[in-house]
Regions:
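Divalent metal-cofactor coordination and adjacent catalytic microenvironments
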Residues: 1-88
Length: 88
């Protein structure tokens, strides 16, 4: 997951690995506390989960990100879809 997120953020070095790993954990925790089952979140092949985490990280990574609100909305939409898909 770390490499997937780093690629989506256009990060090639390891300088930000700790921050990115923390964001990945925070995204998973937010999804879990929003009712998404941990077993669902651990499925590394689930594209909805991967893209939700990616959008969370894009919204939260760095400073002065003019697109952070756009990525936050995308994350919230995917979180809602995950809740529906999981329970459907």
């Amino acid at each position: 997951m770390l490499e997937f997120i780093k690629n989506s953020l256009r990060i090639s070095g390891n300088d930000f690995d700790e921050e990115i790993s923390s964001l990945i954990k925070a995204a998973k925790e937010d999804l879990r506390t929003s009712g998404i089952a941990s077993t669902y979140l651990s499925d590394t092949n689930n594209n909805l989960v991967k893209n939700a985490i990616m959008n969370y990280c894009k919204a939260e990574f760095g400073f002065d990100n003019p697109d952070s609100e756009k990525f936050r909305r995308a994350y919230d939409n995917l979180k809602a879809k995950l809740a529906i898909v999981q329970n459907g």
